[in-house]
């Protein structure tokens, strides 16, 4: 006999957190504009994902064209740096991994200061592959120590940050 599907309550995001996220995305866009790089904001409505992939894929916020290199993707987050590091939601990371795999793109989290300061951190999605999941509250999370993230100042040129991010 087939078990009935149990619907989980949707996670409600605090409006203040939504506003901080929008401010972080705007700050990142202004920084990209100053770099004079081709980039696109990816519209986030549910209709921009094919029906069979809804709930399985997450779109990044920006696609950035690097002349002579190709396309990279950024998911911008307003993040608080905790003593243990940066905390990511496992379900969101898994959905971004699906995006990265299907589109053959390198995806970064651009973790901007939740208070609007110039300090930010880049975390390439694959840096989270070996991070153990830990339950916090009602969801599984990944905590990346801050020294494993790449510090980026929004006052420095994008090109310098990008070169550091791909250096071996």
For each of these PLM feature ranges, what is it?
Residues 119-168:
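Intrinsically disordered, low-complexity terminal regions enriched in charged/polar residues
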Residues 41, 73, 108-111:
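A structural signal for short, well-ordered beta-strand segments and their strand-loop junctions
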Residues 79-102:
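Mg2+/Mn2+-dependent nuclease catalytic core
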Residues 100-128:
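Nucleic-acid nuclease catalytic cores
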Residues 46-48, 79-81, 114-116:
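Short, solvent-exposed loop/turn segments at secondary-structure junctions
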Residues 49-62:
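Charged, often glycine-rich, active-site loop that binds/positions anionic groups
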Residues 1-51:
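Acidic-basic catalytic patches of nuclease active cores, encompassing PD-(D/E)XK
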Residues 32, 60-82:
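Conserved catalytic cores of phosphodiester-cleaving nucleases, focusing on short active-site segments
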